[in-house]
């Protein structure tokens, strides 16, 4: 049969109470040791910071006001030299902008050589000035270099079709002045002028005669270039340019000549 269960249970699996108390003591000791180490580390950091601040304050206090002013003047002068160097460098870039690489190299070398020529004694001033004039005359200016690079090597009258599409009188007058310089043109330009028929006004009320060149376009638009001003005009404007005013049919007063007007 079943035996009676005693009223109190005995501990069988857990550690004795003495061992548990000793384990708690060890854990407390470890915690205390860790906290002490942390405090020591914090103290060392604070001491280092204090020592650094003390050293910097001592150095600042040891300097006289004159030394401090001298240091500030050195810093300001160095900043000014850097700023002036940057400005001169940027201005040199703007001056050389738009030139081909070979002209850029010559101009930069000229600038450096001219800066070195300013240093010799007064005995060599005459030779330095003559050398500088010779070098400056050999190197083209920025405007001449730009015009020589950008100016096309096409005939003067090859710009005429471009002006017909522009429509503004200002551009037409600018290119018309280029066409007025046809006196010094070469054989190619003269051949082109011979292929273009010449025109002149006839039968006007004032009896004036104005000569020009006739140009035809694919859209049927007609433009006439007057010889006197080099302007690109329509038939009605060409008749008005002759001083006859507005007419009903301007083509009746314009005659195409067989020989070119050269």
From Swiss-Prot:
Keywords: Nucleus. GO terms for cellular component: nucleus. It is found in: Nucleus. Its main location: nucleus. Residues 48-69 are annotated as: Disordered. It holds the Pfam family TDBD. It comes from the Eukaryota. GO terms for biological process: negative regulation of DNA-templated transcription; signal transduction. Belongs to the Ninja family. This is Ninja-family protein 3. It comes from Zea mays.
């Amino acid at each position: 049969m079943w035996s009676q269960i005693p009223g109190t249970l005995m501990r069988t699996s857990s550690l004795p109470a003495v061992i548990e108390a000793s384990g708690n003591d060890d854990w407390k000791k470890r915690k205390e040791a860790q906290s002490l180490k942390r405090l020591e580390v914090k103290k060392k950091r604070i001491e280092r910071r204090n020592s650094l601040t003390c050293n910097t304050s001592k150095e600042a206090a040891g300097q006289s006001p004159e030394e401090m002013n001298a240091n500030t003047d050195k810093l300001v002068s160095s900043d000014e030299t850097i700023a002036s160097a940057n400005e001169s460098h940027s201005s040199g870039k703007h001056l050389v902008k738009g030139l081909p690489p070979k002209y850029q190299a010559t101009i930069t070398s000229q600038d450096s050589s001219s800066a070195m020529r300013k240093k010799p004694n007064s005995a060599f001033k005459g030779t330095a000035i003559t050398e500088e004039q010779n070098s400056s005359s050999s190197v083209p200016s920025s405007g001449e270099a730009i015009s020589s690079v950008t100016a096309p090597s096409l005939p003067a009258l090859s710009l005429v079709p471009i002006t017909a599409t522009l429509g503004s009188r200002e551009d037409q007058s600018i290119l018309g002045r280029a066409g007025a310089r046809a006196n010094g043109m070469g054989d190619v330009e003269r051949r082109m002028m011979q292929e273009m028929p010449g025109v002149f006004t006839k039968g006007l009320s004032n009896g004036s005669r104005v000569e020009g060149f006739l140009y035809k376009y694919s859209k049927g638009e007609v433009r006439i270039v007057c010889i006197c001003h080099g302007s690109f005009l329509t038939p009605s404007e060409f008749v008005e340019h002759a001083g006859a005013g507005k007419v009903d049919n301007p083509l009746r007063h314009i005659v195409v000549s067989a020989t070119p007007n050269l």
